[in-house]
Amino acid sequence: MGIEKFETFILISTISILLCICHGFTPVDNYLINCGSPTNGTLMGRIFLSDKLSSKLLTSSKEILASVGGNSGSDIYHTARVFTEVSSYKFSVTRGRHWVRLYFNPFDYQNFKMGSAKFAVSSQSHVLLSDFTVTSSKVVKEYSLNVTTNDLVLTFTPSSGSFAFVNAIEVISIPDTLITGSPRFVGNPAQFPDMSMQGLETIHRVNMGGPLVASNNDTLTRTWVPDSEFLLEKNLAKSMSKFSTVNFVPGYATEDSAPRTVYGSCTEMNSADNPNSIFNVTWEFDVDPGFQYYFRFHFCDIVSLSLNQLYFNLYVDSMVAATDIDLSTLVDNTLAGAYSMDFVTQTPKGSNKVRVSIGPSTVHTDYPNAIVNGLEIMKMNNSKGQLSTGTFVPGSSSSSKSNLGLIVGSAIGSLLAVVFLGSCFVLYKKRKRGQDGHSKTWMPFSINGTSMGSKYSNGTTLTSITTNANYRIPFAAVKDATNNFDESRNIGVGGFGKVYKGELNDGTKVAVKRGNPKSQQGLAEFRTEIEMLSQFRHRHLVSLIGYCDENNEMILIYEYMENGTVKSHLYGSGLPSLTWKQRLEICIGAARGLHYLHTGDSKPVIHRDVKSANILLDENFMAKVADFGLSKTGPELDQTHVSTAVKGSFGYLDPEYFRRQQLTDKSDVYSFGVVLFEVLCARPVIDPTLPREMVNLAEWAMKWQKKGQLDQIIDQSLRGNIRPDSLRKFAETGEKCLADYGVDRPSMGDVLWNLEYALQLQEAVIDGEPEDNSTNMIGELPPQINNFSQGDTSVNVPGTAGRFEESSIDDLSGVSMSKVFSQLVKSEGR
């Protein structure tokens, strides 16, 4: 390829990327290939590069370029590349989620009748198409794949006696946060499928109550079709739109989730003629039988005039998905806040239809109505990695000759690719010299009155930061530690930005949190984190190694925590269940860290965002409290509280703080109480997909605790492994933490004492009973856990000289425990 052609290739690629930047999200990888064409093509304003310019990506033994005349439709459909043997495209990509879109238009070219072609398409880990034949005029297949290597290979395999073809290909990065978490399984509420590695095929993407949304009006180049063709009994529904009222609340749905055009329109019940009528609005969609499907519902209450006015139910295939949905409450008491809900369902055997319905709440009937704004239905790969039924097996081919041709072609193609990519790299470095490290900008700020934009000495390295009082680290050293922010080292995404695993020059592992300019967290949180963590050192607080603000970056470097968050070990990640002893020790460690924050200085420090995701575990599962971006210095000695705007995480937020905007250390105690029940029950603290009485974990757990039947809702993996007196003490501690008023809650010191005691009760040998007697375990108890034996409940506490009566502990729980605490708990922990 000549230099002039290569420069044209770079220019066109840059223009395509800039078009996406203008829309919002910036894809790292952005391949748009006009297959079989000697010239570039366009689709909805986006430029698809000529197949000639991108031919180095292709490994194929034969070159057959097909074309057809005509001016109808986009020119990318007028050419195609034909494969008579196994052929593949190899794309160099960053790891993470990508769109893969394949365009097909079956025209006739010489002896090739595209409508009769039969073939398979596969990636390294998924079969995308099998025994595929294009029967309609134009077909677009869209997939969402999580690429875990540095290359994505798309292989086209003709069926025996046939051929394969493709008109155009897209491979585009999408935000890793777009498909995350563990959606609830409709019909099996205890099941939470892990979506992180799922391959998905888009089956339907619908704009409810609104017009067609073309790809050039979507930040992620998606197309949304109107819902009219899927709607049953159209007279029961009506459409409305109100685009200006849509609110994108930080922490919830964004314009990358769905465009404003989708959230600003909806289909609702047509109940104006009879407001007392109760019925459902239903849509029906075609699906392939035998697969599980991922449903993403988009909601925005643009119909209500006030908060808490709209309550409705959601159904998938006649099964209840969610009841009494109150959108304004789900989005931080915001009217018209954009919100999405995810579900998974299994289609019935032999059924190729799925129905979705909305209907009014049967509890809140003042304003009977129901709405939905958008819906995405995606097919999930089966256990074999297949997204298509058929006989194709990856790695097979029609003949040994095809295999030999593929091997030889791959070898030659790989050699040429190395030369090509080497040339690209040299020219790219020349063009970009002097611009390395540039990022989107923030306004600089200062700490202690001095600018954070000063120059760094050339000798400063990450390994010397422990002796550098100001904790600053040069950007070059951060890049070196993370291999230039290699996406393969990305270990998570939080409210502040991405987190990378790094390694210092001495081999010490670190976690590098790089701020995202689009994040709802910014300068204030960055500064608070530095100020707080540079003051404190405690074995149960995550240590700050340093920070970097060079080139207007906002980067925080912490000690690396090998086992991640407590939340990830409770639900949604598929990790092994924690034992009861491990959970107690984790809670004790976190309580020690919070107790130190509250008492370790002349003025307490209130964390303000205590939750399971902010408690990290090292290689020995020792807990450390993390994420101090929202922390606040507590009140002076002569004050009872700090008046401040409400911040925190929904589900963990102290209701008294929320009502009065008065922050105290007891707000942390409330949040920690929620964590205690989360650790015990192993479920999300807020789950809107559950029945209304179960949505809020704190309320649900307290209901069962007051009935004396908390053991009925604990994590199933704990049954038969908890002593009833240990559970009782743990539950009573959590109950006291969740008192309505802060004055009625214990201090963190008292919480810590009680948790230590719960651990001792679990480990102690009950007098007169062998230690391995299973009748002491919760799994053997009747429902009323408070009715266990009321005999001698005193225990010998290992490592102490005296005996402690359980009743005496109960009597002391509401008062200061400082004297007793000092005898049982060492300041450095265990």
Swiss-Prot record:
Disruption phenotype: No visible phenotype; due to redundancy with THE1. Herk1 and the1 double mutants are stunted. In herk1-1, shorter hypocotyls without brassinolide (BL) treatment than with BL treatment. The chain crosses the membrane at residues 406-426. ATP binds at residues 491-499, 513. Keywords: ATP-binding, Cell membrane, Glycoprotein, Kinase, Membrane, Nucleotide-binding, Phosphoprotein, Receptor, Serine/threonine-protein kinase, Signal, Transferase, Transmembrane, Transmembrane helix. Autophosphorylated. Receptor-like protein kinase required for cell elongation during vegetative growth, mostly in a brassinosteroid-(BR-) independent manner. Residues 427-830 are cytoplasmic. This is Receptor-like protein kinase HERK 1. One of its GO terms (molecular function) is protein kinase activity. Expressed in most vegetative tissues, including leaves, stems and roots, especially in cell elongation regions. Glycans are attached at residues 40, 146, 217, 280, 381. Induction: By brassinosteroids (BR). Its main location: membrane. CDD domains: STKc_IRAK (cd14066). It is found in: Cell membrane. One of its GO terms (cellular component) is plasma membrane. Residues 1-24 form the signal peptide. One of its GO terms (biological process) is unidimensional cell growth. It holds the Pfam family PK_Tyr_Ser-Thr. The gene is HERK1. InterPro entries: ANXUR1/2-like (IPR045272), Kinase-like_dom_sf (IPR011009), Malectin-like_Carb-bd_dom (IPR024788), Prot_kinase_dom (IPR000719), Protein_kinase_ATP_BS (IPR017441), Ser-Thr/Tyr_kinase_cat_dom (IPR001245), Ser/Thr_kinase_AS (IPR008271).
